[in-house]
Amino acid sequence: MKYLSFIFIFVLCAVVSAQNNSLVVEGEKHLKNIRQLTFGGENAEAYFSFDGKKLIFQSKRDQLGCDQIFTMNIDGSNVKMVSNGEGRTTCSYFLKGGKKVIYASTFMGKKECPPNPDFSQGYVWAIYPDYDIYVADSNGKNIKPLTTTKGYDAEATVSPDGKKIIFTSERDGDLELYSMDTNGKNVRRLTNEIGYDGGAFFSPDSKQIVYRGSHPTTNAEIKRYKDLLAQHLIVPTTFEVWTMNADGSNKRQVTKLNAASFAPFFTPDGKRIIFCTNYFATDQRKRNFDLAMINVDGTGLERITFNETFDGFPMFSPDGKKLVFASNRNAAKTGDTNVFIADWVE
């Protein structure tokens, strides 16, 4: 019996090892012990709780018509939907203490899923004007709005000190970054350049902000941007990574890759930025995005993942030991995006 038990354990370990090995792509020296946490559907933007024990993410799965918000343990267990199942949701985050969560939703405008954007004008992102930011208990109950202004309010994240939320809004006619207290008060505009600024995160000390920006310069580019925004659309073909102080001062362009670079996040020491980009793709028209890292001064660009499809939305755990990201690797079918977690190796 002991011998059979040994054989069973050996085979089980071999299967787990084979699964882990199948998730690793040659050249990914910073990632170890990669584990797949979701299996099937579209799962992305997974972010750690402040204690590093849970993840909150958006998912279109099962019979859902569009994304809803879920939480789970960092081993993939105990998956629970915490949004109300109405409208479309995006960009969720835990508040400090883990008892509250925030996310953006369109449900107060319409309870049905909003239509997908019109791709006849090329690849575009929809800027749904019904998006507002809500706070709820971590079990999804007691939903309350944090924003109520006309137009798009979304892409909210929370400072590590737990005091501030940064988000993107078109309340003043353009897509700019704003900060506010976690109760929705003391709203402050941080960016003022025409174009899109969004996807922002605070540095570990809460003193800096990293974000993606796309700023048209020629008259033709500005006209096209404004025309599309009037239709609640943007073209996400070129984003650069930027940083600024938490009060909006000292804006600095970090990347100059002329590519779609987004989802930036500071390393635990605050000296580098990990982000997603199609800069390394041989054909940037295809969905080949990888994780990359760069120093905050724009030097030392390093490729982190080498998967030939999509790797994106990276976030370090609060202790800096793990990295969570979304990827098309090991997809059961075309279009599946899943959440993965890995040990981070310097």
What are these regions (language model features)?
Residues 22, 33-65:
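Beta-strand-rich domains and repeat architectures in extracellular enzymes and scaffolds
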Residues 19-32, 131:
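Blade/loop signatures of beta-propeller domains
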Residues 50-51, 96-97, 160-161, 204-205, ...:
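Residue-level detector of Asp-centered blade-edge/turn motifs that repeat once per structural unit
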Residues 67-105:
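Blade-loop segments of beta-propeller domains
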Residues 39-42, 59-68, 84-88, 104-132, ...:
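A flexible loop/linker signature enriched in serine peptidases of the S9 family
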Residues 55-56, 101, 165, 209, ...:
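Hydrophobic beta-strand positions that form the internal "hydrophobic ladder"
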Residues 73-77, 137-141, 181-185, 245-249, ...:
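Short loop/turn segments that connect beta-strands within beta-propeller blades
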